[in-house]
Every structure is written in C-alpha cells, then in structure tokens.
C-alpha cells in the first residue's frame, strides 16, 4: 500500500485493533501535561507509536523503537515516518525529552535515510532551549538527510495556564519570531539553490507573531506539512480567492443573511480580511467573533483549542448562522474539547452552527 504524507489510509476499524504504545518521554513542552483535570480520558493518552505514524500521520520521537523494530520498518517499507526531532544535539534532546535514550536521533535518522525510508520532521521550538544557534544546527543536520527527510516544520511551543510544577518556559515574542523566520530563510536559500525546494517551513503562527505577511503557496512546495498548521492560512486564502473569482457577478440572496464566523484570536484579523472580501461578493453580512481561550489560558490563541464553554460565554446571539472550523471538533463528531457539542452551542446562540472544512471554497459555500 502506498500513500502520500497528507493522505488518509482509507481504512476504518470498528474498534481499536492496536494496543497503543505510550510515550516514555517527559518532554518539557508536552501539551498533555498542561491539560486541566476532568476532561475525557482519551485526551490524556500520550502515544509514541510508529504504527500510528504510518496509519494516522502521528509524530513519534523514536525513543520507543528497538533495533529489531527499526529493521522491520525498513524490511516492510513502512513510510513515511513522521518524526518529532526537536533538536539533533544529543545532550539537549535528552534534557528536553527527559529521556537518557533520546540522544541517538541522528543515528536513527541516518539508518532510515541510508535504507531509503521516507521521513518528515517536526521541531517544537522553545525559547532558550532549541532556538537560535541550536535551531540552525538542527536544520543543518536535517538538510543532510534530504531527500529521504522530505520536509521539516517548525512550530512554536504552546503554553496553557496549567503549568504548576512544570519546567519554566517562555512564549515567543515578535523579535523571537522574526529571528526564527530569518534562520529558516537562510536554510531555505541553501536548499532552493541546491535542490529547488524550501525543505523547512515555519508555522503560520510565526508569521503572525512577527507581524509579517503570510507567504504565497509557492513557499510551501505543495503543503507537505499543512496538518501541522503550516500553510493552512495561505491555502485557505488562495482557495477563497479562487472561489470568489468564480462567484463574482453571481450575487447571493436579496435578503441579507447574517453569518457569524467563530475563530481564535490568532487568526482574527486574517478572518476579518477574508470576511470583507467574501461579503462584498456574496451579499452576506459577515461578523468575525474571536474567542479568548479562558479554558486553557489567553496565551493559547489557535482555533483548534477553543472550547464550547468559551464560545457560549463570549459569542453573542443575533446571527442567522454561525460557522466554526472543523479543527474545533473531534473527528467525525460534533464534540468540542470540553465535550460541549455544536447542538449545545446552537441552543445557547439560538441559531444553526455549521462545521466547515478549513478551505476557502467550503467557507464560501457554507455561508449560503
């Protein structure tokens, strides 16, 4: 069976066929350690299972793998393997993962690369740990594994308000975000001149934190890391622009509908720009409602971690319909992270709530 990185496997099991291999690390940035008590059990499961990397696209640290298991991956061509690299500095990786066996990452990557196993990498960037010179070192090391290491994403650490007893971590500010983008740009220049690819991609959040414009789609080389929030906003904008070009001149209903767009604070200005363009073409009255994350803490600004409780408390009624992105709800359900459902939100806001794919054309269609 062959599949691209972003493709679903296409198989659905009636029940869990695998006993999930749990994580043996204690990463300084782990978001599960920052969850409040009392949520559903599945949200506290820390998986670090290479089988789920292939089946579901999950990222793994490789600290769970034995030599025999690595040989099996090579023998059966189980790929791509999505790897949480974070740093290639052995001592730093052991310290960040709190695992004395975590330092052999370069040797593991070399083994897979030498045997033709495709990989994608992820770096959760923590100020004062693996940023700046350490980031440059890590990216230089990972460049050496191209093309088997096909792409690398760099995402900022997420910090909730539930950090009592955990390692002290700082969030990125504008200056740190700009410095990170500069380092990534230097590596991209080298990779483009040598291989014609950017190879490493900053998450959307870094551009917004830095106050820089989002790049166009050519920056992302086909969006290999879009599931990590890398290029999602650019892809949305360009698909919306294309849909608006097709719809231009085809006016919507004579009676204006009022549609509310619910999002996180991070994307609020971006969604306002999109709403203004869509409203001008569709005739729909669009209002954007950015939700402050009181549940996890106001430093969590992405839409995927918004809870139903915060929506009900903050979003005013009055629209004919409300749109929420599908990354706010659990897969194949209407449940948000706090088990509040879209039906609960509909009752509170006295209007329909529509779950919309993170796609500009779907967004335009949903407001009809």
Explain the meaning of each model-derived region:
Residues 5, 9, 144-145, 158-368:
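Auxiliary Fe-S-binding modules of radical SAM enzymes
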Residues 80-82, 118-120, 151-153, 199-201, ...:
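Structural preference for beta-strand elements that scaffold enzyme active sites
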Residues 33, 84, 155, 203, ...:
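Conserved residues at the C-terminal ends of beta-strands
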Residues 122-124, 152, 324-328:
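Short glycine-rich or small-residue beta-strand-to-loop segments that form or flank ligand, phosphate
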Residues 84, 123, 153, 290, ...:
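Short loop/turn and capping residues at structural boundaries
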Residues 1-148, 158-187:
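Conserved Radical SAM active-site core
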């Amino acid at each position: 069976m062959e599949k691209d990185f972003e493709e679903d496997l296409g198989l659905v099991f009636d029940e869990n066929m695998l006993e999930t291999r749990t994580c043996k690390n204690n990463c300084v940035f782990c978001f599960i350690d920052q969850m409040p008590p009392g949520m559903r059990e599945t949200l506290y499961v820390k998986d670090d299972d290479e089988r789920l990397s292939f089946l579901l696209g999950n990222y793994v640290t490789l600290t769970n793998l034995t030599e025999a298991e690595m040989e099996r991956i090579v023998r059966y061509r189980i790929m791509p393997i999505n790897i949480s690299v974070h740093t290639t500095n052995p001592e730093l990786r052991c310290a960040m993962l709190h695992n004395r066996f975590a330092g052999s990452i370069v040797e593991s990557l070399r083994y897979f690369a030498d045997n033709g196993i495709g990989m994608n990498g992820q770096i959760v960037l923590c100020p004062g740990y693996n940023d700046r010179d350490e980031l440059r070192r890590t990216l230089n090391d990972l460049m050496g594994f191209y093309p088997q290491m096909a792409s690398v994403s760099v995402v900022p650490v997420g910090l909730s308000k539930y950090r009592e007893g955990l390692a002290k971590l700082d969030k990125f500010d504008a200056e740190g975000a700009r410095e990170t983008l500069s380092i990534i740009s230097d590596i991209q220049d080298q990779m483009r001149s040598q291989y014609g690819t950017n190879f490493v991609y900053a998450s959307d959040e870094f551009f917004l934190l830095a106050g820089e414009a989002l790049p166009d789609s050519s920056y992302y080389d086909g969006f290999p890391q879009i599931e990590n929030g890398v290029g999602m906003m650019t892809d949305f904008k360009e698909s919306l622009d294309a849909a608006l070009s097709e719809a231009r001149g085809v006016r919507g209903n004579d009676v204006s509908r009022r549609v509310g767009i619910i999002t996180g604070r991070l994307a609020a200005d971006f969604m306002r720009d999109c709403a203004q363009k869509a409203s001008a073409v569709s005739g729909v009255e669009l209002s954007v409602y950015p939700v402050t994350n009181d549940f996890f803490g106001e430093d969590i600004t992405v839409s995927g971690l918004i809870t139903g409780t915060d929506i009900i408390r903050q979003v005013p009624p009055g629209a004919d319909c409300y749109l929420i992105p599908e990354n706010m709800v659990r897969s194949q359900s209407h449940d948000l992270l706090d088990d509040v459902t879209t039906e609960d939100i509909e009752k509170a806001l006295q209007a329909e709530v529509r779950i919309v794919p993170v796609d500009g054309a779907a967004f335009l269609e949903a407001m009809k």
